[in-house]
Amino acid sequence: MATKRLARRLGLIRRKSVTPASGNPGGSRLKQLYAYLIVVDFESTCWNDGKHHSSPEIIEFPAVLLNTATGEIESEFHAYVQPQEHPILSEFCTELTGIKQVQVDEGVPLKICLSQFCKWIHKLQQQQTISFAAGDSEPSTSEVKLCAFVTWSDWDLGVCLEYECRRKQLLKPVFLNSWIDLRATYRLFYKRKPKGLSGALQEVGIEFSGREHSGLDDSRNTALLAWKMIRDGCLMKITRSLNKVLTKKNPKILARNLGTDQVEEAATCNMSIQGPSIYQKELQSTVNAEENAQMNSVCVNSSCIKGQLQPKSNMKADLYNIRHSFPLFTTKSSTSVDQLHSPTLNPPLTMQKPSKSDQLALNDSSKSSTLNSNLVLVSTTIPSVNHVSDVEMGHTFDCLPMLAEWEDVVLLPASQAEPDTDCMPPVSDTNVSTSLNSAERSLVPEEPETLSYENFEDLQETPQNSETSKSIVYKSPHSTVYDVKGAKHPGSDASAFKLPKCKPFPFTSVHASAAYPSVLRKDPLLSGGTKRNSLSPPASPRTKRQTFTIHEEKPTSSICSPGTTSCRVSPSVLTSTVNLQEPWKTGKMTPPLCKCGRRSKRLIVSNNGPNHGKAFYCCPVGKYQQDRKCCGYFKWEQTLQKERTNGKALSHSSEGLTFSSPETSRIHDRNLSFPIKNSLRLRPSMRH
């Protein structure tokens, strides 16, 4: 006995520590930061055949709640998890963990297990008033009791659960991103390396209770070891965290990357209205009831009138101004209406206080346009035809319900003061919509959208005083259609109009080239030198269409009509500026910049699952590089393609005057996502 006492006094023999029955162990303890510790110890699938297997899956999910003040285990959570990748356990796994195949077959998937675990945590938060902290903080108070997770090594939460959630694309709870590595804490506190959990318990004089490699038994023994270390004066602190921390390196790169992200977000949510100008507010204040039905399905393909409208007289001088105003087209793209409609460009004096009908038309046109347009002379939509129909429509002043059926027309006022042709502002070059709300002005339809499919070179225009040679083709209470074959407009000296082939591509915006004057000369409104009679305008009515029509994209369709055998194309008329060979269509796309300013890396999902084979971009910095930190950038390639597609389409729609056929324009409208609804709405004649 004396020898044992001497050996214990010299520290050669350690005596097993026994907690008194009162529950108050002896020894001085530091005040802990965390009032509760949740100890977890997962068991996963394993093999010993020497073959390469996939990552392990959790098959047992245990957790125990330890009170750091009393050392008692107040609550426990336990569930068996059904593996999905390898549902059959190996013999080695069954012998090591003691888990049988029947137990995992009756278990729940990891997703449901995490949901049950979160419910258990939520119940503890309500009963014990605990909360989780990402890192070290102030000690727990009587009101809020801090809690932290404890594991034996970083494998449980840092490797096993982390990568399984990534493979199965499960949302891991945020509070599982920080934990205390008890093995590392043990090594720092006792200054020695433990030989496993059972070896560490033996070194401090605690016998292992239960079965080794049983998840619940390992969690209980780990809690006993943590309590022993707390009694010995160890202060438990967070040792590992997966929460993203902003790096302090390269602040300029971070600022530049942040600005790039903001630009991309602005491009995806284009046409965001932040605050209209004073002139727009004045127009909007008079039409509160018309704002919900102001855009049609072709609101991005034809011109609208804003500001001063062109009168019907003095067309030759106006045509001269148009020819000289095309070089003045602006190509600067913008995404904000405030930037597009500059408040410094005041409207003419004649439009400072427009009438009610003018305000309705102006408000609808200004809403749908993306750049301010002060003059519109001709429709910017090229019909998908080769010949103009040789019929003429005569209408009275109250034929607005019928005219509302036609689209893509030019709106001219019945009477208005002639402007100064020397001070004509430049024409805007964007896709704008035609306003059909003014019921008090004369509407003149120009170049219908659906015309007869014949040779376009035999275009004929009928003078106003040729009604004696006409034969009535169609007559209604509002309009009369005559056959005017053989008549020819004396003032029309335009050459043959040739249209380019329409290639099947979702974006059909093209810029006007030097041949604009020849194109505009074809318009009967500009070629005629006299003012049209508003009661009988020589126009070609288009075939009536249904109010709601679903158009399908035809990849082999072109502008050429199905009845024609040949289609002549003049590349000098319209030149396409859209690159038909998009980089992402060919499989090559420049990787975007990640958050740390580096060029991201393109990877492909190789694991089994719903995203198998998908490509994504992530930070090129590896997670295990000590000198660098990964910024955590991640984006699917499909999402990036959609963002760049929208940005490409918006840039083309704002850089030049867009010409598009009716079929491709509908495809263009369907592919673009605008914040303003481009759904089918009631026509102006049906709103009242």
UniProtKB/Swiss-Prot annotation:
Cofactor comment = Binds 2 magnesium ions per subunit.
Q: Does the keyword Magnesium apply?
A: yes
**This protein is called what?**
ERI1 exoribonuclease 2
Where are stretches of biased composition, namely Polar residues?
337-360
Q: Where is this region: Disordered?
A: 337-367, 523-546
Please list the residues that make up the active site: 43 (proton acceptor), 213 (proton acceptor)
Q: Which organism is it from?
A: Mus musculus
- Which EC class is the enzyme in? hydrolase
GO MF terms here are: 3'-5'-RNA exonuclease activity; nucleic acid binding; zinc ion binding
Gene name, Swiss-Prot/TrEMBL: Eri2
Q: Which UniProt keywords apply?
A: Exonuclease, Hydrolase, Magnesium, Metal-binding, Nuclease, Zinc, Zinc-finger
Residues given in the record as Mg(2+) 2 binding sites = 41, 156
Q: Which SUPFAM superfamilies match?
A: Ribonuclease H-like (SSF53098)
